[in-house]
Amino acid sequence: MSQLVYFSSSSENTQRFIERLGLPAVRIPLNERERIQVDEPYILIVPSYGGGGTTGAVPRQVIRFLNDEHNRALLRGVIASGNRNFGEAYGRAGDVIARKCGVPWLYRFELMGTQSDIENVRKGVTEFWQRQPQNA
């Protein structure tokens, strides 16, 4: 199975979700000056920002990570967290990234997710990678 790459703000909601998920994952650093580069296809798990507005939904660190052409080329799908209080903007970062990068928006969950979200993502990620061509 290929990896997960995720970003978690200082609230650590996404970090807690990843810990409960129990799958291999690499974190995009909170410090914007630190950079990482991935070497295999991955699914991105990202929180949504901006309080429901149309701009600012994708964290700056994630934008910087995806602006690296090498990292962007290996992106295969996106999972977003958000807050249902923001209505239609719930999980908007996933929609933005999926549209701009041409990858599927696989799932969204609220805040740090429920046990059901953990099970759905674990199963969905496994099935997603099984359907991918070996050299994808």
UniProtKB/Swiss-Prot annotation:
Transmembrane segments: none annotated. It comes from the Bacteria. Signal peptide: none annotated. Pfam families: Flavodoxin_NdrI (PF07972). GO terms for molecular function: FMN binding. Probably involved in ribonucleotide reductase function. This is Protein NrdI. The lineage of its organism: Bacteria, Pseudomonadati, Pseudomonadota, Gammaproteobacteria, Enterobacterales. The gene is nrdI.
